[in-house]
Amino acid sequence: YLILWEGGFIMDQRYQKLMDCYACFQKKISFVPQVALVLGSGLGDYANDIKVVAELDYKEIEGFPTSTVQGHEGKYIFGYVGTVPVVCMKGRVHYYEGYDISDVVLPIRLMKLMGAKVLFLTNASGGINTEFRAGDLMLIQDQISDFVPSPLIGANMEELGTRFPDMSEIYDKKLQQIIKKTAAVNDIPLEQGVYIQLTGPNFESPAEVRMCRILGADAVGMSTACEAVAANHMRMHICGISCIANMACGITPNPLTHKEVQEAADRVAPRFKKLVTKSIINIAKEIPLDE
């Protein structure tokens, strides 16, 4: 990870790559977001509700990882939700696509450098909690990320954060309260629970789902947790909503497909869009984002 530069300076390749991507962004876009939003599988249509001022395809950023998954278009959207300046990832990259974990979280780190203070994560997941049903929305209260490598492994990038970051409140409790209140006021049913990230791309076996339940997980997916680790390292305020696209293997007798995930996301889209939009507006009212 370390390379020697002229004059004897040592620079982390991962940090240099991040800064190269940031320099490329600065040449193309002058927009400064306050909130960063990541749209999960099948949820990309939310970007149509943003008052767009600019777009940047991932392929236009030299060295930037690009998504290969159906339902993940692969571009940054810059614009406004209400009057709140946001940057939206329309499509994310996943560890199972073969990228190094540092590349998987590079888009998150870049949004922090752009100016975003809040990270709003979304995903489509499998329900483990038997009280859940396909189409439910779950507020992520905590996570289990030990089944994928930590993006903090390797020499610490001191410019981004401390070597041993605290993880006692990854998902900001104040943001959780704002989202729960927003859901209640707008009559949007909202579950809450723990999200666990496994590597994918294969869906989980029934035995693995039983293991996840024993560990305390309510929903399982193939993204998000590693992104939250990287964002927490950079001291971002993090919140997350998981769309329960299907019940996990062993809970339902039916085989799981990616098409099912996308169809469930389509069904929940109106509630999802309303909750995300109103939550972002309320977050901006209650959290000082322009300081």
Name the predicted role of every residue range.
Residues 1-10:
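Short, Lys/Arg-enriched N-terminal segments with co-localized hydrophobic residues
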Residues 11-167:
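Metabolite-binding pocket within alpha/beta catalytic cores that recognizes anionic/polar moieties
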Residues 24, 28, 174, 178-188, ...:
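Generic non-transmembrane alpha-helical segments
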Residues 117-118, 218, 237:
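Short acidic/polar active-site loop segments enriched in Thr and Asp
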Residues 176, 182-218, 283-284:
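Active-site/ligand-binding-proximal alpha/beta "capping" segment
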Residues 249-291:
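His/Asp/Glu-rich mid-to-C-terminal helical/loop segments that flank catalytic regions of hydrolases
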